[in-house]
């Protein structure tokens, strides 16, 4: 083996050793740093930003009436066809929705319904926890959409998810603990 080949081999060895040392330094640095995983839902909860597109909600006007004029533009523009609006006219001739349902199991949360609404009656809020065991529970009606909270002015952080009062704590009964949890799920 010539001297040039020996130098090249030594150089390659030191280069790989330097790369290995850099990788190990980075690995040990992350190993001893604080974790970045959020302990959801036990100890931490994420607050979405105000521009986050979560659950739908319907707005009311100054008199407390629903803002929706049942023009059905939101239902027509929806790419998932998950909005159903049935209009009716009251005695004054104003249009209102007799039925307004959104199937959130099919919804993409794209916000096109919010953009298409001429009365600014429908909007997407910040709630992201609305899972269910039944897909029928994910169909939200007009009264439920009116009762949902709107957008918060602040957001984009992590807050403690610990309960402040003991009255909200749910205690599992003896038969709900352990391996029998799946027997208590209602099947529809």
UniProtKB/Swiss-Prot annotation:
GO molecular function, one term: iron ion binding
Protein EC: 7.1.1.-
UniProt binding sites for [4Fe-4S] cluster 1: 68, 71, 74, 117
Membrane topology: Peripheral membrane protein
Catalysed conversion reaction: a quinone + NADH + 5 H(+)(in) = a quinol + NAD(+) + 4 H(+)(out)
Xref: InterPro entries: 4Fe4S_Fe-S-bd, 4Fe4S_Fe_S_CS, NADH_quinone_OxRdtase_chainI
Residue ranges annotated for the 4Fe-4S ferredoxin-type domain, each copy included: 56-88, 98-127
Cofactor: [4Fe-4S] cluster
Enzyme class, spelled out: translocase
Note accompanying the cofactor annotation: Binds 2 [4Fe-4S] clusters per subunit.
Record SUPFAM superfamilies: 4Fe-4S ferredoxins
GO cellular component: plasma membrane
Binding-site residues, [4Fe-4S] cluster 2: 78, 107, 110, 113
Protein location: Cell inner membrane
UniProt keyword annotations, A-Z: 4Fe-4S, Cell inner membrane, Cell membrane, Iron, Iron-sulfur, Membrane, Metal-binding, NAD, Quinone, Repeat, Translocase, Ubiquinone
Main localization category: membrane
Stated family: Belongs to the complex I 23 kDa subunit family.
Job description of the protein: NDH-1 shuttles electrons from NADH, via FMN and iron-sulfur (Fe-S) centers, to quinones in the respiratory chain. The immediate electron acceptor for the enzyme in this species is believed to be ubiquinone. Couples the redox reaction to proton translocation (for every two electrons transferred, four hydrogen ions are translocated across the cytoplasmic membrane), and thus conserves the redox energy in a proton gradient.
Self-association and partners: NDH-1 is composed of 14 different subunits. Subunits NuoA, H, J, K, L, M, N constitute the membrane sector of the complex.
NCBIfam families to which the protein is assigned, alphabetical: NuoI
Name this protein carries in UniProt: NADH-quinone oxidoreductase subunit I 2
Annotated source species: Rhizobium etli (strain ATCC 51251 / DSM 11541 / JCM 21823 / NBRC 15573 / CFN 42)
């Amino acid at each position: 083996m010539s001297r040039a080949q020996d130098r090249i081999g030594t150089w390659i060895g030191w280069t790989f050793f330097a790369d290995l040392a850099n990788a190990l330094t980075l690995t040990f640095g992350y190993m001893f740093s604080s974790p970045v995983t959020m302990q959801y839902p036990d100890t931490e909860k994420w607050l979405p930003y105000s521009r986050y597109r979560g659950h739908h909600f319907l707005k009311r006007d100054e008199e407390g009436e629903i803002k929706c004029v049942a023009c059905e533009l939101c239902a027509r523009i929806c790419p998932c066809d998950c909005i159903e609006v049935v209009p009716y006219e009251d005695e004054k001739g104003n249009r209102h929705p007799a039925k307004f349902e959104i199937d959130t199991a099919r919804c993409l949360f794209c916000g096109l319904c919010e953009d298409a609404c001429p009365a600014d009656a429908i909007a997407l809020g910040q709630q992201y926890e609305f899972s269910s065991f039944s897909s029928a529970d994910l169909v939200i009606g007009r009264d439920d959409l009116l009762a949902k909270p709107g957008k918060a002015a602040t957001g984009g952080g992590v807050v403690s998810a610990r309960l402040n009062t003991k009255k909200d704590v749910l205690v599992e009964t003896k038969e709900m603990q352990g391996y029998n949890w799946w027997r208590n799920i209602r099947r529809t």
